[in-house]
Amino acid sequence: MNVSVVTERRTPAYSSLAAGELNGLVARALLTEARLTPKPGLVDIRNSGAHRDMDLAAFERSTTAIAPWMEKFFIMGNNTAALAAENVLVMLRPLGMACENDMLQATNGVNTHRGAIFAFGLLSAAIGRLLARGEPLEQNRICDQVARLSRNIVAHELSAKKAGKLTKSETHFQCYGLSGARGEAESGFRTVRTQALPVFNRVVQEHDDTHLALLQTLLHLMAWNDDTNLVSRGGLEGLYYVQQQAQKLLWQGGVLVEGGIEAMQSLDDELILRNLSPGGSADLLAVTWFLSHFPAGSLYPE
């Protein structure tokens, strides 16, 4: 079965953005990612991937619950723009916890979007800060603000030795050196900017097909992102297996060649059998789509 979903074309780049518009753009990013099909090991229209406790309807309910919170992150970033960015993160945490609570209520306790709340909460606050400062909304400026908001988050939250049992995130970092979502945020979404966005833009330009561009970008993320969701489910062996399989498909041309979609479906079936789900890469794909709506801007913003 060849599953294909037509996704909307990108809108013109945003030069400005009202708080209410932000809610809608984030919702579209999350729904575009969720409905993209086929996605190996992930919830999509075809199946629920390696997840027995969630489906596409749960992701849609979750998106409806959390999207309105992006305006609140935006306002907090806007109102605290005069403060040093690293002092704002503590003010964003209560919003994140409340947003997560609404997500859990909408999904009957299932974690559908915790990583996305973290990523898009920071992105929304970063946009609020930039607009308050009269700075243009550009990919690199937005990501630079995210990096500033997240400064030293890995050292503070993952590397410190604590009494008692380590969390999964602490274990991933202290045992394997994997910093997960926190490290990606602290880097200003380096993986998205240096790998995902260039692939996405190239495929859109060459093929005029957002659906293919997103699938090819997902393969690149699966191939090179050290996804701690995979480590949680399958250890380093699971991570390396997914990376190797994605790299193999890319060497063959990915979804841009005949049989590419079918190969993605076969990999989906295999990851379901192995109970592997690259959820971190899915979050970064949604971030990629979101950021693609803004101009790139200068590489080193002032």
UniProtKB/Swiss-Prot annotation:
Q: What is its EC number?
A: 2.4.2.52
Q: Which InterPro entries match?
A: CitG (IPR002736), TriPribosyl-deP-CoA_syn_CitG (IPR017551)
Which UniProt keywords are present, listed alphabetically?
A: ATP-binding, Nucleotide-binding, Transferase
Kindly list the biological process annotations in GO that this record carries: prosthetic group biosynthetic process
Q: Name one GO molecular function term.
A: ATP binding
Question: A Pfam family name for this chain?
Answer: CitG
Q: Which reaction does it catalyse?
A: 3'-dephospho-CoA + ATP = 2'-(5''-triphospho-alpha-D-ribosyl)-3'-dephospho-CoA + adenine
Domain of life the protein comes from = Bacteria
Q: Which PANTHER family match?
A: 2-(5''-TRIPHOSPHORIBOSYL)-3'-DEPHOSPHOCOENZYME-A SYNTHASE, TRIPHOSPHORIBOSYL-DEPHOSPHO-COA SYNTHASE
Name the protein family. Belongs to the CitG/MdcB family.
What is the protein name given in its UniProt record?
Answer: Probable 2-(5''-triphosphoribosyl)-3'-dephosphocoenzyme-A synthase 1
Source species? Salmonella typhimurium (strain LT2 / SGSC1412 / ATCC 700720)
* Taxonomic lineage from the root: Bacteria, Pseudomonadati, Pseudomonadota, Gammaproteobacteria, Enterobacterales
